[in-house]
């Protein structure tokens, strides 16, 4: 499995999609035979997984958007991305 770094440019794997689940009234990552519920923060990050933006770029954008510390945001983004990658929901 690839190592996640600030230069990684993740995207959703084939067959995985970001979708609003009406039954749960929550955003989820929908993959074959599984559903991963996303909280508000995870949703904002997952919406930026397009395969072109690095995690550092995503963190910088979010830091500016939410007036937050970029290094803290980057740590959180890398942690979330690592978790989702380990669940085989992302490609790098």
Curated annotation (Swiss-Prot):
Entry's Gene Ontology molecular function annotations: quinone binding
Pathway the protein acts in: Cofactor biosynthesis; pyrroloquinoline quinone biosynthesis
GO terms for biological process, alphabetical: pyrroloquinoline quinone biosynthetic process
Keywords carried by this UniProt record: PQQ biosynthesis
Keyword RNA-binding listed: no
Family: Belongs to the PqqD family.
Function: Functions as a PqqA binding protein and presents PqqA to PqqE, in the pyrroloquinoline quinone (PQQ) biosynthetic pathway.
HAMAP family for the chain: PQQ_syn_PqqD
Oligomer and partners: Monomer. Interacts with PqqE.
Protein name: PqqA binding protein
Naturally occurring in which organism (per UniProt): Xanthomonas campestris pv. campestris (strain ATCC 33913 / DSM 3586 / NCPPB 528 / LMG 568 / P 25)
